[in-house]
Every structure is written in C-alpha cells, then in structure tokens.
C-alpha cells in the first residue's frame, strides 16, 4: 500500500467534502437553481444545464414544446446556449412562491446583444416550476416568452 498516496487523499478529503457541501448549498433554493441554469446556458456547460432539468421537463417557447430533457438536449439546447453566450440578460423583476416540495420562479428580463449578426433588444418573461426530490430541486417546467 502506498502510504503517501493515502496520506495525500486523507489531506484532500476535507476540502472535497467542503466543495461538495458548498455545491449543495449553492443549489438549496429554487432561485439558485434558476440562476445556475442560466449561468450554465451562458457558459456553454451542457451537462450542468441537463443536470438541473427533470427527465420529464416540459419546455414551452414561441408556441412550440419540448416534452423531455432528452428532446431539449437534441433540439434547442445548443442554440439556447449560443444565444445566452452572445447576449446579456438583466433581471428586472423576480417573484417566487410555492412550498417545500413545489415552487415557481417568475422572472422578467431585458436582453441585449448581437446574435447571428442581428441586434437583440428584448423584454422577456420566464416561468419555471421546480420540484424538490431526493436529489434536490429540479426544473420540471419552463415557459419562455419575449418581444
């Protein structure tokens, strides 16, 4: 047995546990999950986006619907990440309601930037419904609208 490797692992264990606890604490409220979702979209972190969505998430946008996490991953996730990276959104208003198991987060935004050679200046509304399970809060529904 390599005692140096074991000693190094034992020395690193507290920091690994702290990092894990910190990540859990960072996603302890519906609002922090919504913020993490948008941060992952803008940062191009596909796996982080998908990890925050329930498998059976329903996503409504511009009259269209994606009926699962897998469908979203294979259809609009890429372009949503590209749009989020190219633009800047400012939260104008946010409200939350619900209880310990189900919560909703309503957000109004102003978005600006250039996307695919087109100037963007839009007001948006977003409704997210989250459900709390064994693995924490997951997004079960998103409805986006903008003008």
Where are these predicted regions, by residue range?
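Bacterial N-terminal signal peptides that target proteins for export
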Residues: 1-8
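N-terminal, post-signal-peptide region of Sec/Tat-exported proteins
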Residues: 46-82
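Second-shell loop/turn segments in exported
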Residues: 38-39, 58-63, 116
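Short beta-strand edge/turn micro-motifs at domain boundaries
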Residues: 123-147
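Beta-strand elements of well-folded, non-transmembrane domains
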Residues: 42, 111-115, 130
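A mature extracytoplasmic/lumenal domain signature
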Residues: 53, 63-64, 107-111, 126, ...
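Short, low-complexity N-terminal intrinsically disordered segments enriched in polar/charged residues
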Residues: 11-55, 71
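Surface-exposed, charged secondary-structure patches
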Residues: 58, 74-120
